[in-house]
């Protein structure tokens, strides 16, 4: 008997990598032109080193909406924020870039995985998005079962 697998049943780091691969391979997600020169937030000094960072961030946001929904841009800025280095003065928390998160959410809306919440309280995952994420998780679980 095959047990149903959801995104919550698999390792979060692995599922994000698999979702990112799926988004890149599907060709539906278009990386913005400015992605090679942008920082991920005010707390970062350099642009991301991973060339597929946009797919990974979009996949991470999709997983986050699966687990905790509805979620808005400001809440996601807190999740992806970090410590800002200020030299000899103690560090402070700084939010992540709202533009990057907003564009990633708009990308997920374009492929019909995410929609705006009817009450205006952020965004929620659609049935199609939930179904696709569960399918990716079950394929991941099956591949792990065959390789182990």
Curated annotation (Swiss-Prot):
Keyword Transcription attached: no
Function (record text): Elimination of the ALEP-1 gene from all somatic cells in its fully activate state may represent an alternative way to gene regulation.
Protein name per its UniProtKB record: Small ribosomal subunit protein eS19G
Keyword hit for Transcription regulation: no
GO molecular function: RNA binding; structural constituent of ribosome
InterPro entries: Ribosomal_eS19 (IPR001266), Ribosomal_eS19_CS (IPR018277), WH-like_DNA-bd_sf (IPR036388), WH_DNA-bd_sf (IPR036390)
GO biological processes: ribosomal small subunit assembly; translation
Alphabetically ordered keywords of this record: Ribonucleoprotein, Ribosomal protein
Family: Belongs to the eukaryotic ribosomal protein eS19 family.
Gene Ontology, cellular component aspect: cytosolic small ribosomal subunit
């Amino acid at each position: 008997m095959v047990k149903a697998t959801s995104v919550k049943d698999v390792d979060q780091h692995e599922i994000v990598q698999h979702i990112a691969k799926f988004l890149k391979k599907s060709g539906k997600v278009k990386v913005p032109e400015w992605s090679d020169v942008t920082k991920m937030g005010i707390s970062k000094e350099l642009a991301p080193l991973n060339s597929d960072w946009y797919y990974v961030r979009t996949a991470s946001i999709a997983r986050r909406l699966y687990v905790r929904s509805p979620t808005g841009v400001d809440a996601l800025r807190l999740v992806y924020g970090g410590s800002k280095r200020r030299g000899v003065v103690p560090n402070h928390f700084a939010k992540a870039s709202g533009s990057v998160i907003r564009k990633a959410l708009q990308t997920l809306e374009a492929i019909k995985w995410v929609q705006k919440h009817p009450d205006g309280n952020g965004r929620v995952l659609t049935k199609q998005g939930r179904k696709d994420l569960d399918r990716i998780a079950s394929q991941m679980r099956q591949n792990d079962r065959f390789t182990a």
